[in-house]
Swiss-Prot record:
GO cellular component terms, A-Z: plasma membrane
Lineage, opening ranks: Bacteria, Pseudomonadati, Chlorobiota, Chlorobiia, Chlorobiales
Organism: Chlorobaculum parvum (strain DSM 263 / NCIMB 8327) (Chlorobium vibrioforme subsp. thiosulfatophilum)
Function according to Swiss-Prot or TrEMBL: Channel that opens in response to stretch forces in the membrane lipid bilayer. May participate in the regulation of osmotic pressure changes within the cell.
Name of the protein described by the UniProt record: Large-conductance mechanosensitive channel
Protein's membrane topology: Multi-pass membrane protein
Single GO MF descriptor: mechanosensitive monoatomic ion channel activity
Length: 151
């Protein structure tokens, strides 16, 4: 059983998948930082200084009544909130991740096509059909060996 597990774990596909998951986790952190620290602040400035992380709707007030200026205030007061600003950040992250994966897969597919050998042309047939008896005969035959017809 240990031998079977070792064979499974050391297969190329399993190792490749593990590397992909690790790199994907690191890439997720980079994309989250790109969205939260680089893209949404200028976008917020264009929208009169809106901070997307603080875009929320209070569904039910908490122990201390509102208004709450920041999401952290509402959450610390125990308010139930609908955090659509965090959803916008997550959606932007998803779009960036999807575009990055699309271009990565597209590049890999192009490389794969470049390294693939073109298919070999089909060999010319070495037999043909006799028009009189319909049996298979060599292409170069001038007389059918079965019905002795002149071809």
């Amino acid at each position: 059983m240990l031998k079977e597990f070792k064979e499974f774990a050391l297969k190329g596909n399993v190792v490749d998948m593990a590397v992909g998951i690790i790199i994907g986790g690191a890439f997720t952190g980079i994309v989250k930082s790109l969205v939260g620290d680089v893209l949404t602040p200028p976008l917020g400035l264009l929208l009169n200084g809106v901070d997307f992380t603080n875009l929320f709707v209070v569904l039910k007030e908490g122990a201390t009544p509102g208004p709450y200026l920041a999401l952290e205030q509402a959450q610390s007061a125990g308010a139930v909130t609908l955090n659509y600003g965090l959803f916008i950040n997550a959606f932007i992250s998803f779009v960036i991740m999807a575009v990055a994966v699309f271009f990565l897969v597209r590049g890999i597919n192009r490389l794969r096509k470049m390294t693939e050998k073109p298919p070999e042309p089909a060999a010319a047939p070495d037999t043909k059909e006799c028009p009189f008896c319909f049996s298979a005969i060599p292409v170069k035959a001038v007389r059918c060996p079965n019905c002795t017809s002149q071809l």
